[in-house]
C-alpha cells in the first residue's frame, strides 16, 4: 500500500486522486475527520483503507517496538498531514503535530527502507529575501514556519544515517481543487471566486511594505503541478533532498484577482487596509529558486497564474 497522511486534506486528496489515475487503489489514507466536511475531497477517490491519524501513529510505534501492529505492507509514505494554520500560535500543539509526528514516520520509513516524501514549507524562509534551500536564508516568521524548519533541520542532522529515499518539498503558495475546507487558510484564488459568486468584488491588501496596492507578490503554484513533482520523485528513488516546490516565478496577487474578474466578466478589485496583526509576520514577496529541483532532473513546466487559476475556476464550476 501507499500511505498518504493528510489524505483528506488539500494536497493529500489531490495525491490520492492522482494515484487512482495511475491505477493505484491500494491507498491508505491517514487523517483526522473530526471536521467531517473534508470527506468531500475523497468522495470521488478509491481507497484501500482509512485510519485515523492517532490510530496510525500508535500502529507505527508498535511496529518500531517489534510488536504486532496490524499495519499492511507499506511501500511508500507521502506525509502531507500537518497543522498548516500560519496564525496558530500554540507552539506545543504545532510541534506535536508537525515535528514529533513527522519524526516517528521518518524513522519508520528508514526502518522499513521505504520512501518518505514529506511536506515542508516556504514558511521556513519567512523574512528572507533569498529562497534557496540553505540555513542562512531560513528566517521563519511564525511557529508554523518554525515547526517545518525544525523538522528539516532534524532531517539534515540525520542525513548520513538514511538508507532509503527522503524528500522534503518546500511548498510555496499552492492553490487549486479540494481546498475549500481550509476556510480562511484557503488560497486567494478560492476566496476571490467565492467573493464574486456572492456578488462582491475581489478584495486585496492595499499598499504596504514598499509595494503598491495588490502588487505584493508570491510564487503561486498549481496543486496539479505539485502532485506531478511528488509522483516524479516517487518514480525516481535515487532522488533525495529538500527541494523548493514553486514555479520559479513571483506574480502579484493582483494577477489572481484580474484572472477571476476576466473569467466571470464582472467586478473590480477592492483594496483594504493591511491588517495590523499581520505587520512583521507577513511575506510580501516569495519566489522559489528551483535550481536544485531542476538539477535533480525534473524538467516539466509549471502553470502561470492565469493558466492555473483558469483551470481551477473551470473545476469549481464543473
Swiss-Prot record:
Keyword NADP: yes
Keyword Chloroplast tagged: no
Positions annotated as active site in the UniProt record: 144, 182
Subunit-level organization: Homopentamer.
Catalytic reaction annotation: ADP-D-glycero-beta-D-manno-heptose = ADP-L-glycero-beta-D-manno-heptose
Co-factor binding details: Binds 1 NADP(+) per subunit.
Pfam families (alphabetical): Epimerase
Biological processes annotated in GO: ADP-L-glycero-beta-D-manno-heptose biosynthetic process; carbohydrate metabolic process
Residues that bind substrate: 173, 184, 191, 205-208, 218, 282
Gene: hldD
Cofactor(s) the protein requires to work: NADP(+)
Reported function: Catalyzes the interconversion between ADP-D-glycero-beta-D-manno-heptose and ADP-L-glycero-beta-D-manno-heptose via an epimerization at carbon 6 of the heptose.
Sample GO molecular function, one term: ADP-glyceromanno-heptose 6-epimerase activity
Domain note: Contains a large N-terminal NADP-binding domain, and a smaller C-terminal substrate-binding domain.
Keywords: Carbohydrate metabolism, Isomerase, NADP
EC code: 5.1.3.20
Pathway: Nucleotide-sugar biosynthesis; ADP-L-glycero-beta-D-manno-heptose biosynthesis; ADP-L-glycero-beta-D-manno-heptose from D-glycero-beta-D-manno-heptose 7-phosphate: step 4/4
Origin species: Chromohalobacter salexigens (strain ATCC BAA-138 / DSM 3043 / CIP 106854 / NCIMB 13768 / 1H11)
Enzyme class, first EC level, given as a word: isomerase
Residues where NADP(+) binds: 10-11, 31-32, 38, 53, 80-84, 97, 148, 174, 182
Protein known as: ADP-L-glycero-D-manno-heptose-6-epimerase
UniProt family annotation: Belongs to the NAD(P)-dependent epimerase/dehydratase family. HldD subfamily.
Amino acid at each position: 500500500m501507499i500511505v498518504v497522511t493528510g489524505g483528506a486534506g488539500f494536497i493529500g486528496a489531490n495525491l490520492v486522486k492522482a494515484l487512482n489515475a495511475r491505477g493505484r487503489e491500494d491507498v491508505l489514507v491517514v487523517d483526522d475527520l473530526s471536521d467531517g466536511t473534508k470527506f468531500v475531497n475523497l468522495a470521488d477517490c478509491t481507497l484501500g483503507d482509512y485510519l485515523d491519524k492517532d490510530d496510525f501513529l500508535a500502529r507505527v510505534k508498535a511496529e518500531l517496538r517489534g510488536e504486532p501492529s496490524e499495519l499492511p505492507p507499506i511501500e511508500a509514505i507521502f506525509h502531507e498531514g500537518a497543522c498548516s494554520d500560519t496564525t496558530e500560535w500554540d507552539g506545543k500543539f504545532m510541534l506535536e503535530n508537525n515535528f514529533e509526528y513527522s519524526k516517528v514516520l521518518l524513522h519508520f520509513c528508514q526502518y522499513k527502507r521505504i520512501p518518505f516524501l514529506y511536506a515542508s514549507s516556504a514558511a521556513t524562509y519567512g523574512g528572507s529575501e533569498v529562497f534557496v534551500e540553505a540555513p542562512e536564508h531560513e528566517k521563519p516568521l511564525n511557529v508554523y514556519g518554525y515547526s517545518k524548519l525544525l523538522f528539516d533541520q532534524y532531517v539534515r542532522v540525520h542525513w548520513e544515517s538514511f538508507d532509503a529515499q527522503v524528500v522534503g518539498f518546500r511548498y510555496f503558495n499552492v492553490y487549486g481543487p479540494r481546498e475549500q475546507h481550509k476556510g480562511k487558510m484557503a488560497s486567494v484564488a478560492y476566496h476571490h471566486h467565492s467573493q464574486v459568486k456572492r456578488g462582491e468584488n475581489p478584495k486585496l491588501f492595499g499598499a504596504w511594505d514598499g509595494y503598491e496596492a495588490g502588487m505584493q507578490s508570491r510564487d503561486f503554484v498549481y496543486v496539479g503541478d505539485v502532485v506531478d513533482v511528488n509522483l516524479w520523485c516517487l518514480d525516481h528513488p535515487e532522488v533525495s533532498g529538500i527541494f523548493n516546490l514553486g514555479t520559479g516565478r513571483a506574480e502579484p496577487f493582483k494577477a489572481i484577482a484580474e484572472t477571476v474578474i476576466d473569467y466571470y466578466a464582472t467586478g473590480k478589485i477592492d483594496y483594504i487596509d493591511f491588517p495590523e496583526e499581520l505587520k512583521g509576520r507577513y511575506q510580501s514577496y516569495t519566489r522559489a529558486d528551483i535550481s536544485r529541483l531542476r538539477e535533480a532532473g525534473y524538467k516539466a513546466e509549471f502553470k502561470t497564474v492565469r493558466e492555473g487559476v483558469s483551470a481551477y475556476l473551470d473545476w469549481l464550476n464543473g
